[in-house]
UniProtKB/Swiss-Prot annotation:
Name of the protein: Peptidyl-prolyl cis-trans isomerase, rhodopsin-specific isozyme
Annotated signal peptide: 1-20
Principal location: membrane
Role noted for this protein: PPIases accelerate the folding of proteins. It catalyzes the cis-trans isomerization of proline imidic peptide bonds in oligopeptides. Acts on the folding of rhodopsin RH1 and RH2 (but not RH3) and is required for visual transduction.
Localization terms from the record: Membrane
Ranges for domain PPIase cyclophilin-type: 30-190
Pfam families, sorted: Pro_isomerase
EC number(s) from the headed UniProt entry: 5.2.1.8
Topological relation to the membrane, as annotated: Single-pass membrane protein
Protein family according to the UniProt entry: Belongs to the cyclophilin-type PPIase family.
GO biological process, alphabetically ordered: 'de novo' protein folding; intrinsic apoptotic signaling pathway in response to endoplasmic reticulum stress; N-glycan processing; protein folding; rhodopsin biosynthetic process; visual perception
Source organism of the structure: Drosophila melanogaster (Fruit fly)
Top enzyme class: isomerase
Expression sites by tissue: Expressed specifically in photoreceptor cells.
Amino acid sequence: MKSLLNRIILCSAFLAVASGLSFTVTSRIYMDVKHNKKPVGRITFGLFGKLAPKTVANFRHICLRGINGTSYVGSRFHRVVDRFLVQGGDIVNGDGTGSISIYGDYFPDEDKALAVEHNRPGYLGMANRGPDTNGCQFYVTTVGAKWLDGKHTVFGKVLEGMDTIYAIEDVKTDTDDFPVEPVVISNCGEIPTEQFEFYPDDFNILGWIKAAGLPVTSSFCVLLIFHYFFRQLNMYC
């Protein structure tokens, strides 16, 4: 009985992994954030370098080296929309009107990255003004935002620090979604890492097995009880 139960759970787990979406994280970037000069926390992004190599290269370069002497350090989160996203990275003008990249003012979308669905919080994507207008600005979703699907290059996801993202989301803004008090990237850098497969936050196979174990076991116990009583009835019929 125990062997059969284990096989069912393992088989279900295998099917879940086979059908589950995963991303190859090729590098990790962190950003430290301050609100009105007070530390808020750190965000750690896992970047999808195989899915969006050009976009990841641009983002990493701006973080680590900058363009024309300017990196993301000191730049603001200039757009904060509750229950939607936080947006930053305008290292040109600081207000969402500027654009620059290692490829020029703009660079094209990457088709595979356009196909990623914004079905949960924490996705890192390129802000744009339309197709093929990627530059330096990026956003992080705070909810599932399916209306962005197919319109933006998704190139990473928050691995740690969603509490920091939500803290940014909670700051007071004006009527143009611009924070009243500055929300600034005070530091950023790279965390050495070997590439690994990353499953979205709500897909946790170990947690699924733990969660499934008790219900499946309970179901089998109920079936065994019914089976026992049916056998007893047959003995007296």
